Curated annotation (Swiss-Prot):
Consists of 3 domains; the N-terminus binds the ribosome, the middle domain has PPIase activity, while the C-terminus has intrinsic chaperone activity on its own. Belongs to the FKBP-type PPIase family. Tig subfamily. It comes from Oenococcus oeni. Keywords: Cell cycle, Cell division, Chaperone, Cytoplasm, Isomerase, Rotamase. Residues 170-255 form the PPIase FKBP-type domain. One of its GO terms (cellular component) is cytoplasm. Its EC number is 5.2.1.8. One of its GO terms (biological process) is chaperone-mediated protein folding. Involved in protein export. Acts as a chaperone by maintaining the newly synthesized protein in an open conformation. Functions as a peptidyl-prolyl cis-trans isomerase. This is Trigger factor.
């Protein structure tokens, strides 16, 4: 039978959503903590005349005093006792507490004060059967034709232009160019037989535009001004002239939409109508998946928007916790690819593990989590040990790591929380009513 720890917890409200949680650590737990702390340190203890790891606790205490073990003892026993104190005080906290121990006393209970931040309260609106607009999954002729056109462009080939044809955006020109500023050439301003797709934005603004409307064999003086923030400081903001010779003009030639094209695109079909049918089927599947995701997101957002959260300004601790969860997910994804965090940070020019998002998106994500947690509480959603074990197996398989590694990197409490939120989402989505989008 598990002993129930009584902490005599009390909570005193402070300014805003801050406050002080005061509680006691019973003597029995202090004694247990000191034992754990000694066992942790004993292999490192070095006393003349004794081998490492063979010093008794009594000798250690006589030599160094209990105080030498207090920090490790507190670290060992505090998490569970703090959680019990929070439950006794009937409060919901966010972030990490700032612990202020009075002092540890082996023979009696020790008083602890913790500066804590209270979680905002949530007043739910409707969350079952909410009506949400949903796009039709039907594929229109316009959408099908656009996809067929995209497939045609994918099979297009560059062919030499006819003599009377002029260059347009999307065409490719093969050019020589020689640039100068104030009549003087500059490094990197000259090339021969350079292949340039007009409209690609490879060159500074204005350069490609001035090559539109010309034929192969034309000589063109292109006049441009380098941007003020141009990487070469000696050219930034300066006017330049490029002497350009167009050697070749090539245009994209798209194949005809016929049976031969259909067989080139998909060797499992024989005629164009088969390709159209398969393409339409794929578009419908993709559209249905996209609409499903949008419908679910809209249903959840409607529930979040219908809830009242007090205070409206979320504690910074909640934002920080959210960022930590994102980082955990990010590094779990890396682990699934065989990349350790230290390996990632050694790669040059890598972005941060969690890209910065604007305050509104961050706040909405935390609000969503609060609302889902409240729904889970009201609906008494409590994942079973079997469900948690199943999730551990699923994560191990997804990230290609051992189950023991999942258990090390993600606590059972975090897994339980994620499953609660997931089941709250399912409750909202499964009961939501789809209405035709106007």
């Amino acid at each position: 039978m598990v002993d129930i720890i009584k902490t005599n917890a009390t909570f005193k409200a402070g300014k805003g959503n801050k406050g002080t949680l005061s509680f006691e650590i019973p003597a029995k737990q202090i004694s247990s903590g000191i034992d754990q702390a000694f066992n942790k340190q004993k292999d490192k203890i070095n006393i003349p005349g004794f081998r490492k790891g063979h010093v008794s606790k009594e000798l250690f205490l006589a030599r160094f005093g209990e105080e030498a073990l207090y920090e490790d003892a507190l670290n060992a026993i505090l998490p569970d006792i703090y959680d019990q104190a929070v439950n006794e005080a009937d409060i919901t906290v966010v972030g990490q507490p700032q612990i202020i121990p009075d002092d540890l006393k082996h023979g009696g209970p020790s008083k602890i004060h913790a500066e804590v931040t209270l979680a905002p309260t949530v007043e739910l609106g409707d969350y079952k059967g909410v009506e949400v607009e949903k796009e039709s999954d039907e594929v229109s002729d316009k959408e099908l034709n656009a996809e067929l056109e995209r497939l045609q462009k994918g099979e297009a080939e560059l062919v030499p232009a006819k003599e009377d044809q002029v260059s347009e955006k999307g065409d490719t020109v093969v050019i020589d160019f020689d640039g100068s500023v104030d009549g003087k050439q500059f490094d990197g301003g000259k090339a021969q037989n350079f292949s340039l797709s007009l409209g690609s934005g490879q060159f500074i603004p204005g350069f490609e535009d001035q090559l539109v409307g010309h034929k192969a064999g034309d000589d063109v003086d292109v006049k441009v001004t380098f941007p003020k923030d141009y990487q070469a400081k000696n050219l930034a903001g300066k006017e330049a002239v490029f002497a350009v010779t167009i050697h070749e003009l090539k245009k994209l030639e798209t194949p005809a939409l016929d049976n031969e094209f259909a067989k080139d695109v998909d060797d499992s079909v024989l005629v164009l109508e088969e390709l159209k049918a398969k393409t339409k089927e794929k578009l419908a599947k993709d559209k249905a998946e996209k609409n499903k995701d949008a419908f679910e997101d809209a249903a959840i957002q409607k529930v979040v928007d219908g809830a009242k959260i007090n205070p409206e300004k979320l504690p910074e601790e909640m934002i920080n916790d959210d960022v930590s969860r994102q980082m955990q997910t990010f590094f779990n994804n890396l682990a699934g690819q065989g990349v350790k965090p230290e390996m990632y940070f050694q790669i040059p020019n890598q972005p941060g593990a969690v890209k910065a998002t604007n305050d509104r998106r961050r706040t909405n994500r935390v609000k969503t989590n609060l609302v889902l947690e409240e729904i889970a509480r009201v609906e008494k959603i409590n994942p079973s040990n079997e469900e948690i074990d199943k999730e551990i197996k699923s994560l191990a398989s997804e990230y290609n790591i051992k189950e023991s590694e999942v258990e090390k990197s993600v606590s059972a409490g975090m897994l339980s929380h994620d499953l609660k939120v997931q089941q709250a989402v399912e409750l909202i989505v499964n009961s939501a009513q789809a209405v035709e989008k106007k």
